[in-house]
Structure formats: C-alpha cells, structure tokens
Amino acid sequence: MTEQKITFADQKRKTVEIAEFTEDGRYKRKVRSFVLRTGRLSEFQRNMMNNNWATLGLEYQTTAFDFTQIYGNTNPVILEIGFGMGKSLVEMALQNPDKNYLGIEVHTPGVGACIAYAVEKQVKNLRVICHDATEILQDCIADNSLAGLQLFFPDPWHKTKHHKRRIVQPHFVEKIQQKLVPNGFVHMATDWENYAEYMLEVLTSAVGLHNTSATNDYIPRPDFRPLTKFEQRGHKLGHGVWDLFFIKNIT
C-alpha cells in the first residue's frame, strides 16, 4: 500500500496560526500552532487549492501586503472575514470588478470551495487567506488601506460564558477602524439578535465610526449583499437577520 502524499492543502488543514491575548482581552504578539479539526477536505477542494494557490492565495507575512502589486491595480480593497464556503464573496467580486476583495477563512474545505467557484467564474479581483484574521490585521494590513470590512454571520458563541470568544470585541473594532480609509465601511450581519445587540453596542462605542442607520440601529438587508447559506438557515429556523453598516469618519 502506497503512502499518500501530504500536499500543500493537507498542511493548511492540519495547522493554522492563531493570535493570543492577555487576560483582559488585548492582543499580544505571540503565535502558536494548533490542530484544526475541520470537515473533510474533498479531493476536488484539495486539488483546487494545490493548483490555484499561487494565483488566488496569499500567505501570512510580517510586513504589510502591497495591494497594488497583488491585484495589479489601485482599486479599493474590501476585506471579508470568515467567508464560509465563499459563494457570496465570489458573487460580490463578480458584481464589482472595480473593487478588489480579500477573504480570510481558517476552514480549508471553505477555502477550497471558494477557490473552485472563483476559478469557475474566472474571477480575477479576489484573493484568499487561510490564517487567523487577527494576525492578518495586526501584521499584514497597513493602516488606512481598506475600503471596507465585511463580517457576515460569525459564530455567535451564544452561551454567556463563551461571549468572550466572539470575534466582535472593542479591541477588534478598534483595529478595524485603524485599517479603514476615511469613509471606509464596516458591514456586519448576524441572525442572532443577542449578538446583533452586542455588535451595535461595540460599534456605537467605537471612536471614529458613525452609524448609517436612519433609526440609529440596523439597516434593511442591502441588495448588494448576496444571501448566504447561514441567512437561509436562519430564515428556516425563524430567526431574523440584522445588518449593521458603519462608516469611518473623515478627520
């Protein structure tokens, strides 16, 4: 019996770099690896990652990305954190060829599926990263370089004792605000009302951001945000969906 070759995609599946924090939730510059127990990476997804990473994938680095070099233009860059299987991200890239999209996802089946769909649709204005988002924001994204941040249906960690694990925290939003250009946007969506209320509280408290909602809370689902499988799941479960759209002030 021949031993199966460990490919690039297999290595991505087994380890991913994550950030660590102090007891009060502040980021500290220390990196460790851990075994990521994800869903099965199909042979098709594995091949898509192995064969297309050079053109669609980016690796973590300790210096800021040069977006002009990466995309070959100076179009605005929109970052999406946690794109799942990537269908809506690819669709947004297709609908907006005058914008560049950068997606972060730690689960390799989703990364493989996103790359496959991007290849199928011949998308050129999209790059993906399989790495912890906090590390990428800290080291790879220059201040005042992003036109927008999208965070759609992140894990709600609905148990109270797990709320500290939610990605939306004051220090996270503070970091996002630093990375946005003036008039850059933060667009979040969730199908958990408690998480929506918490997102609203954190975003409203952030210095340098203002809410675009006419009622100073949530906005109707915008036409430019494609329906995701998580949103469809929420509808089936009778959940509402809450969109938040904040803009960075011009100072």
Curated annotation (Swiss-Prot):
Keywords: Methyltransferase, S-adenosyl-L-methionine, Transferase, tRNA processing
Kinase found in the keyword field: no
EC number: 2.1.1.33
Binding-site residues, S-adenosyl-L-methionine: 80, 105, 132, 155
Catalytic activity, reaction form: guanosine(46) in tRNA + S-adenosyl-L-methionine = N(7)-methylguanosine(46) in tRNA + S-adenosyl-L-homocysteine
One Pfam family this sequence matches: Methyltransf_4
GO MF, one example: tRNA (guanine(46)-N7)-methyltransferase activity
GO cellular component, as recorded: tRNA methyltransferase complex
Signal peptide coordinates: none
KW ATP-binding (keyword) present: no
Active-site residues, Swiss-Prot/TrEMBL: 155
Enzyme class: transferase
Family: Belongs to the class I-like SAM-binding methyltransferase superfamily. TrmB family.
Protein name: tRNA (guanine-N(7)-)-methyltransferase
